[in-house]
Every structure is written in C-alpha cells, then in structure tokens.
Amino acid sequence: SAQENLPELHRPLNIPPVLSGNFGELRSNHFHSGIDFKTQGRTGFKIHCAADGYVSRILVSPWGFGRAVYVTHPQLGLVTVYGHLESFSSKINKIVVEEQYRRETFRIDMEFKEGEIPVKKGEVIALSGNAGSSGGPHLHMDVRDLATGDALDPMNYFKHLFFSFEFY
C-alpha cells in the first residue's frame, strides 16, 4: 500500500520520543493538526530538520504557534512545521531580526522560495520552547501534503522512533 512506502523522517529531538498530543484530537476550537513531543518540562532542546529541503515560511506571533518554522521538502512532496519554538538557528534568526527591525514589529509572517534558506536533514533549525498558545514546553510538529496543504498524520513518518529497539 502507499502507507508502506512513506519516507522515514529524521527524529526532531535527540531525547526519547514521548507524545503529549496526537493527530486529529479535538481541541477547544480546532482539530489538532500534528503531534506534540514532550520536552521533559524544559525548553532549549535542539530541533533537527526532518529531511533535506528549504525554509519556506517563518512565523513569529504572541499566540498560535508563537515562533514557527515551515520546511518544504520538494523531493518528498511534504512540508514539515515546527511550532512553539524558543528561538531559531542563527541563520534563520538573522533574517527574522532584520525583518522585525525593518517593519518595526514583533509579529512577522515571511515566505521564502527554494534556494533562499536551504536546510539539510538533521540540521539544527531551532530550539524547543513554550511560545505562543502553549500549555507547557513541547515541540508541535505537523506534516503536510505539499500539493494540497492537507495535514497528514505525522506518526506515519515517525513510526521508526517509537517501534524500534534503539534506546538513547
């Protein structure tokens, strides 16, 4: 089936994967579009890019995802979204700060084309946080269909993190 041929995405965190939220849960005003990885009650864990691609969107807001990075993976036909971030990697942060000064505003929503901010599988793109509308430190992660924008169940791409005999 198509399900069996899905790519395995790189682990976003180098800590044992524990979920605090699942895909499709009914929240107060929306369906949960991704999965939430617990971060041991702390912020500041390195977040690793799931696959080769490019940063396609950066969000900074006092609510919602707070700080978020969207990475487009053209070869996989996917977009991965990393939310509630404490901070961005230096190459991403430089762009964010310049834009905040230019616009004289904290809130930004910037989109980028392929080639502008390339990222590699496993590259550190941010630090985990508790920003935006977050009830405690965690990493929110979406996997979306590049063509339709539909939210996909991330567990289909991260099964290997949960059902293996590797313990760290």
Q: Which residues does each PLM region occupy?
A:
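A solvent-exposed, charged loop/short amphipathic helix patch at secondary-structure junctions
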Residues: 96-107
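Surface-exposed, glycine-biased beta-strand/turn segments
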Residues: 2-79, 86-91, 105-108, 112-115, ...
